[in-house]
Amino acid sequence: MAYPFQLGLQDATSPIMEELLHFHDHTLMIVFLISSLVLYIISLMLTTKLTHTSTMDAQEVETVWTILPAIILILIALPSLRILYMMDEINNPSLTVKTMGHQWYWSYEYTDYEDLNFDSYMIPTQELKPGELRLLEVDNRVVLPMEMTIRMLISSEDVLHSWAVPSLGLKTDAIPGRLNQTTLMAMRPGLYYGQCSEICGSNHSFMPIVLEMVPLSYFEAWSALMV
């Protein structure tokens, strides 16, 4: 999860988030090189006395500054499109969980089980135990098996919401009357925190998400107790 004064993204826990981190570094390097070139040209203009006031056109220069930006945009677009297709591809999910946004809580339904569903509310600050996180803890965590492909179906009962867990690279809009889907896979166990990322009313800040990723054997024992 995030920590105070953090500058970068959260540590990647899923294959998708690892790809997003690589893409972030790739794009940042391109931006850094462009910025360095622009600063170098500006410094030359300020320090040199050589000018070309009589130059009316320069076909070679115009060709370069037309083709070069096009190449740079292609270098950014290709890996971006690859990740978009990866995020949209869901093949043979091992488990499907339906998520519904409400003002202001989340409800979850494990569709592969006959009667496994619950609501998830934020724990008020005055009820937190030592070591628990303010505005991020919930009364019912979403327990899921790690290292398995999980399909999340996301919608809303009232207004627009957004179901987001940054360390897993997840952010999907919850839209009334529409069912969006995304894929989830965690490579290691642990607690992963998120929040509603779409302003949805006065208590928008009080809609946390907590995923508890566990080994398959633990998940089977938990689901048996819940059902």
Swiss-Prot record:
GO terms for biological process: ATP synthesis coupled electron transport. The keyword Transmembrane helix applies. Pfam families: COX2, COX2_TM. Its EC number is 7.1.1.9. Cu cation A2 binds at C196, E198, C200, H204. The chain crosses the membrane at residues 15-45, 60-87. Binds a dinuclear copper A center per subunit. Mg(2+) binds at E198. GO terms for molecular function: copper ion binding; cytochrome-c oxidase activity. Its cofactor is Cu cation. It comes from the Eukaryota. Keywords: Copper, Electron transport, Magnesium, Membrane, Metal-binding, Mitochondrion, Mitochondrion inner membrane, Phosphoprotein, Respiratory chain, Translocase, Transmembrane, Transmembrane helix, Transport. Its main location: mitochondrion. The modification Phosphotyrosine is found at Y218. GO terms for cellular component: mitochondrial inner membrane; respiratory chain complex IV. It is a multi-pass membrane protein. It is found in: Mitochondrion inner membrane. It is an enzyme of class 7 (translocase). Component of the cytochrome c oxidase, the last enzyme in the mitochondrial electron transport chain which drives oxidative phosphorylation. The respiratory chain contains 3 multisubunit complexes succinate dehydrogenase (complex II, CII), ubiquinol-cytochrome c oxidoreductase (cytochrome b-c1 complex, complex III, CIII) and cytochrome c oxidase (complex IV, CIV), that cooperate to transfer electrons derived from NADH and succinate to molecular oxygen, creating an electrochemical gradient over the inner membrane that drives transmembrane transport and the ATP synthase. Component of the cytochrome c oxidase (complex IV, CIV), a multisubunit enzyme composed of 14 subunits. The complex is composed of a catalytic core of 3 subunits MT-CO1, MT-CO2 and MT-CO3, encoded in the mitochondrial DNA, and 11 supernumerary subunits COX4I, COX5A, COX5B, COX6A, COX6B, COX6C, COX7A, COX7B, COX7C, COX8 and NDUFA4, which are encoded in the nuclear genome. Belongs to the cytochrome c oxidase subunit 2 family. This is Cytochrome c oxidase subunit 2. It comes from Cuon alpinus.
